[in-house]
């Protein structure tokens, strides 16, 4: 079965498709197809029908001839070779011609034959596609015109007016002509003799369309051939036709474009006799000689010479060649201009030198050799000097020639008058009260009472204009106003007379000179008396201590000698010689601006301040019920810590301790015990503590009383002290004990010696010389440095 297949594989599976090696392969038959009886069941035969008398040709049989041609050709094939080998594939198109005459077209634009075959006779019936479909096929439409356009409001008051206007516009549009064949048929206009292919699928080129020069040479014509053809009008005597004007623009628009005319390239002598041209409007048709020509509705016999087409052809060729010559000349001119401009640029580049000195930093870039650098610098200097000399020579030559040209030219034409000198008129200062002050009577000369006409100056002549022009100085300085020296003096207590400016009159004699009055000379602003010039010494006159010495600081009191709030500045250190009851007071009384001794006033305890946070000694409730006991944060006082002194207490009262004062150490610090050397300052409070004035604890000094038993403190011996430069605590922060004052004493409450520091809550105790604390009525402790 394998050798009977048409796939080309034989029994021995070694052949290429021949009869000896096996069956032929499909598409690989050599030297034509095999005979009909070779393959009973191959292509073209059927097992059921037996052998086919004429087997089918293979679809690749045309490749046989192509392979033969390819075997003969050698080398690479280009596109031209391939297209040439394929042979011409164009065929001539034949227009379709109906079998019988078609009926005339209908008025509604449809084809008469198709309408007659499909819809029957529909003469004088408006075409309605929806009605026709419903009548023939029963298809009803739901078309609504307002879905695609504006809905007409037929009930409007101006509907009829708008309908008439629409009809007028429709008639105007339908009456217009169009070169489009489709639009012309829709408007019912008469069609021309062009066939359907030319009207609907052809390209109609406008008469004045641009045609490139290469296309003109290929077509054998110039652009002049594409101009609109004129309308020929023949004379009655049969002479040469004369171009005539179109009858009307409407007739020119209605005429379709003329068919393309072919122009022969044969010479004039070898041309056969051409038939005459029949002219009707703008359509030209070939007719015989002495034929009738319809011109403006009149039949005229015209004779056209057969040499006309040859002359026109030669004329068009001449115009085309001349146009090409003009274009070539224009291109050559442009090229020469570009070359000239390029030459100018090259010349400028060769001769131009920068008119600036050569920068020093460019020399290493131009050359690395020092000798060459010096040469380059010398050349640049010489070129710069030459450029400057050239400019100076040009500047000297130009002004020397200009006056010669101006003087040599003489013209009788009037020259424009030069600008007149600007005269500034500054009015005098009017009097302060013009109603009370009147101008004194001025003697008026007799000539002023007469009616004298003003004498106008004559028109300036060319000589006067030239003289005025020579007086103008272009290098004059800027105008600066200066007061008149002959102005009348101004006195505030006397009326001032504003001088009147009289018109310029020619001098008539000594009478005019006698009428003028002498005006005293003086300063225009200060008049008679000028102010004396004084010398100002800025260092001496503007010295605030010129009339008094600078007061020493110790002589200035602490009071505020100005009205308003009285302010006193406390000294940073208390004087050791001050009396025990010396205290600083701030009073609004102007009689006591400075501190003075006063008796301790009886007053209740100091009200506690309410800072945000504070801590008290354990076992004592806070004086004001703040939850958590948060009063003051833990902080250490600065080196300049010196609170203001307080006032003594009055009648002893049982009160809770006051809150912590600003800038005071904390009362108590919670937590683990710390190193004494780094222990921050702390304060202790006692609700009732007797006040015992006197000196601080020392050798044999009195001891302080405490409300409860204190642990023994073996620090009673005098220690070596150092002077404290500031009133703040020492680096080794001691512990402070804070106690309120009480007037009466409790002898049974005696305790061991007090700690090193005890302080009243109202003030801090300043230290005296040697660091010893000075006692006072408000002091109940000492500070040990």
Curated annotation (Swiss-Prot):
Start-end of Basic and acidic residues biased regions: 59-76, 157-170, 182-200
Listed name of the protein: PAB1-binding protein 1
Organism whose genome encodes this protein: Cryptococcus neoformans var. grubii serotype A (strain H99 / ATCC 208821 / CBS 10515 / FGSC 9487) (Filobasidiella neoformans var. grubii)
Binding partners and assembly: Interacts with MKT1.
Comp. bias regions, Polar residues: 231-240, 508-517
Family: Belongs to the ataxin-2 family.
Keyword field: Cytoplasm, Phosphoprotein, Translation regulation
Key word Phosphoprotein present: yes
Consequences of knocking out this gene: Abnormal sexual reproduction; decreases MFalpha1 expression and abolishes basidiospore chain formation. Decreases virulence in a mouse intranasal inhalation model for pulmonary infection; virulence is completely lost in a double knockout with CRZ1. Resistance to high temperature; resistance is suppressed in a double knockout with CRZ1. Resistance to tacrolimus (calcineurin inhibitor). Resistance to dithiothreitol (ER stress inducer). Resistance to tunicamycin (ER stress inducer).
PTM statement from Swiss-Prot or TrEMBL: Phosphorylated. Probably dephosphorylated by calcineurin.
């Amino acid at each position: 079965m394998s050798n009977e297949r048409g796939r080309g594989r034989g029994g021995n599976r070694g052949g290429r498709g021949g009869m000896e090696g096996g069956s032929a392969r499909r598409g690989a038959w050599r030297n034509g197809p095999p005979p009909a009886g070779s393959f009973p069941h191959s292509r073209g035969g059927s097992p059921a029908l037996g052998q086919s008398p004429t087997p089918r040709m293979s679809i690749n049989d045309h490749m046989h001839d192509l392979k033969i041609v390819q075997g003969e050709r050698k080398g690479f094939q280009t596109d031209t070779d391939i297209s040439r080998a394929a042979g011409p594939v164009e065929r001539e198109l034949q227009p379709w011609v109906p079998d019988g005459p078609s009926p005339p077209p209908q008025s509604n634009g449809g084809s008469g034959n198709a309408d007659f075959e499909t819809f029957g006779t529909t003469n004088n019936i408006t075409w309605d596609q929806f009605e026709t479909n419903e009548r023939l096929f029963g298809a009803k439409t739901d078309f609504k015109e307002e879905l695609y356009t504006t809905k007409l409001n037929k009930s409007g008051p101006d509907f009829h007016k708008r309908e008439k206007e629409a009809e007028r516009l429709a008639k105007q549009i339908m009456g217009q002509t169009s070169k489009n064949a489709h639009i012309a048929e829709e408007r019912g206009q008469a069609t021309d003799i062009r066939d359907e292919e030319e009207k609907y699928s052809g390209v109609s080129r406008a008469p004045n369309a641009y045609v490139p020069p290469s296309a003109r040479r290929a077509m054998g014509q110039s652009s002049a051939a594409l101009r609109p053809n004129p309308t020929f009008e023949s004379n009655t005597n049969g002479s040469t036709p004369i171009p005539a004007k179109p009858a009307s623009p409407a007739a020119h628009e209605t005429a379709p474009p003329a068919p393309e005319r072919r122009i022969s390239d044969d010479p004039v002598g070898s041309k056969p006799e051409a038939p005459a041209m029949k002219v009707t409007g703008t359509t030209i048709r070939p007719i015989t000689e002495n034929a009738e020509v319809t011109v403006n509705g009149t039949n005229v016999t015209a004779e056209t010479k057969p040499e006309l087409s040859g002359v026109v052809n030669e004329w068009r060729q001449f115009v085309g060649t001349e146009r090409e010559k003009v274009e070539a000349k224009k291109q050559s001119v442009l090229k020469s201009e570009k070359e000239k401009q390029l030459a100018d640029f090259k010349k400028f580049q060769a001769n131009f030198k920068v008119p600036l000195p050569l920068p020093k930093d460019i020399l290493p870039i131009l050359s690395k050799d020092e000798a060459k650098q010096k040469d380059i610098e010398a050349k640049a200097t010489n070129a710069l000097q030459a450029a400057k000399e050239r400019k100076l020579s040009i500047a000297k030559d130009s002004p020397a020639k200009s006056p010669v040209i101006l003087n040599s030219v003489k013209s009788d034409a009037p020259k424009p008058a030069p600008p007149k000198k600007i005269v500034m008129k500054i009015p005098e200062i009017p009097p302060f009260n013009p109603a009370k002050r009147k101008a004194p009577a001025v003697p008026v000369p007799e000539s002023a009472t007469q009616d004298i006409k003003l004498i106008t100056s004559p028109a300036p002549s060319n000589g006067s204009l030239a003289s005025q022009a020579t007086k103008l100085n272009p290098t004059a300085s800027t105008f600066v106003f200066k007061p008149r020296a002959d102005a009348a003096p101004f006195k505030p207590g006397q009326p001032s007379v504003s001088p009147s400016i009289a018109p310029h009159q020619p001098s008539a004699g000594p009478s005019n000179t006698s009428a003028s009055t002498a005006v005293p000379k003086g300063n225009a602003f200060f008049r008679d008396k000028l102010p004396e010039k004084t010398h100002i010494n800025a260092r001496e006159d503007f010295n605030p201590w010129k009339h008094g010495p600078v007061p020493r600081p110790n002589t200035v009191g602490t009071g505020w000698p100005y009205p308003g709030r009285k302010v006193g500045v406390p000294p940073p250190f208390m004087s050791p010689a001050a009396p025990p009851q010396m205290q600083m007071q701030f009073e609004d009384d102007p009689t006591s601006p400075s501190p003075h001794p006063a008796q301790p006033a009886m007053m209740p305890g100091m009200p506690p301040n309410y800072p945000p946070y504070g801590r008290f000694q354990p076992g004592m409730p806070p004086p004001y019920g703040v939850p958590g006991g948060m009063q003051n944060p833990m902080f250490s006082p600065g080196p300049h810590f010196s609170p203001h002194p307080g006032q003594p207490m009055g009648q002893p009262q049982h009160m809770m301790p006051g809150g912590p004062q600003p800038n005071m150490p904390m009362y108590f610090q919670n937590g683990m015990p710390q190193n004494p050397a780094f222990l921050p300052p702390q304060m202790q409070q006692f609700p009732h503590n007797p006040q015992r004035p006197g000196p601080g604890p020392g050798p044999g000094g009195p001891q302080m009383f405490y409300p409860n038993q204190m642990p023994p403190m073996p620090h009673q011996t005098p220690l070596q002290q150092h002077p404290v430069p500031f009133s703040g605590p020492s680096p080794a922060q001691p512990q402070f004990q804070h106690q309120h004052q009480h007037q009466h004493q409790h002898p049974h409450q005696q305790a061991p010696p007090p700690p090193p520091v005890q302080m009243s809550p109202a003030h801090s105790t300043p230290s005296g010389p040697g660091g010893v604390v000075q006692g006072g009525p408000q002091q109940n402790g000492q500070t040990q440095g």
